[in-house]
Amino acid sequence: HEKDYEKESEIFEKEDYIDWKYFIYFYEDKPIAFTELKVFDNSHVLTGQFAWDYAEPKLGIGTYATLYEIDWSIKNKYNKYYLSYGYEETSIYKSKYDGFEFWNGNSWIDNKSLYKELCKQDTNIKTLSQLNKYQRRYFKINNG
């Protein structure tokens, strides 16, 4: 934050060029979670962010939200539902859903084992040098 640039940064933050939609989830009449999503070309849905309050982990609100949104996408005749970005071990759960695919840099693939391994490797990267080595190895694997 630089002094005297507050007005520009406030304007920048207010101008969101993506027309996000929101699903808000309630428990006992209180909002406890939300998903931010975007519909592209009236045919594909991309979730951008999911957040919840962690007060009732046994509710499984993340799984509930994902299944609800997939069902909503099907009922609204969207072709694809993209469950946001995938990286690090925290994203492995995304591969449990039927029809799972991920972008490998060249094409969409459904290799869940490779996806899980890539997520685990992401978690272990701590330096730019490690990232560079990882990227070289990754693209060598995917480009033959």
What do the PLM-derived regions correspond to, one by one?
Residues L83-G144:
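Terminal substrate-recognition subdomain of acyl/acetyltransferases
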Residues H1-K58, E88:
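A conserved beta-strand-loop-helix scaffold within acyl/acetyltransferase catalytic domains
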Residues Y68-K75, K96:
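Short basic/hydrophobic patches in alpha-helices and adjacent helix-turn junctions
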Residues S73-S84:
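Conserved GNAT acetyl-CoA-binding A-motif
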Residues K58-D71:
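Conserved acetyl-CoA-binding loop-helix of GNAT-fold acetyltransferases
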